[in-house]
Amino acid sequence: MKVCIAEKPSVAKEIADIVGAKNRHDGYYEGNGYQVTWTFGHLCTLKEPHEYTDSWKQWTLRSLPMIPTRFGIKLISDRGIEKQFGIIESLMSNAEVVINCGDAGQEGELIQRWVMQKAACKCPVYRLWISSLTEEAIREGFQNLKPQTEFDSLYFAGLSRAIGDWLLGMNATRLYTLKYGQNRQVLSIGRVQTPTLALIVNRQLEIEHFVPQPYWELKTLYRETTFAVTKGK
């Protein structure tokens, strides 16, 4: 049996229609030698600090920086995710071939790879790489499947991004919370959220400190018609 794993249910439905997997089951489609299942975006994430060592349970400055010797992944704690992962894991355990049908990009590669790692997938894996869900694009994609190993660099790029976010977020959040949280609140720091917050704060400060300045507009009168500059308003 060939097991296809899409990144979302709607994509799985499109793929199932093309490959002939017409029978709907709980969490997957089946038919014509295929089983088509799906994730809901991220099913797995990097482990929390305390899951690496008990010494990182307490938030202390002396424990920083926290740098795991080897990063590990875990299933996100959610009943729906746990159920769907169980279905995926069961399908993979009996698969002859797995086809990674994740979104064509760095994050799509990371999402599916983590699921396959967590499910201990041992059979050959191929990659469906498409940027459109038209029937023609899907059929062409299945005719040009490539070994997943050809996309290892894309996976490692996504993994590096995730690890970088973890190192910054976990360490900086604890640092700023301990130094400036005054034992009342967690000061969350992140690669994207903190610069975005800074943009908002800076803009608000500009508004609060705005001082009106006199300005002039250029106008001219020609044959009883007034012309004015509007560009840049």
Give each language-model segment a name.
Residues 6, 161, 165-232:
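Prokaryote-biased recognition of long, low-complexity C-terminal linker/tail segments
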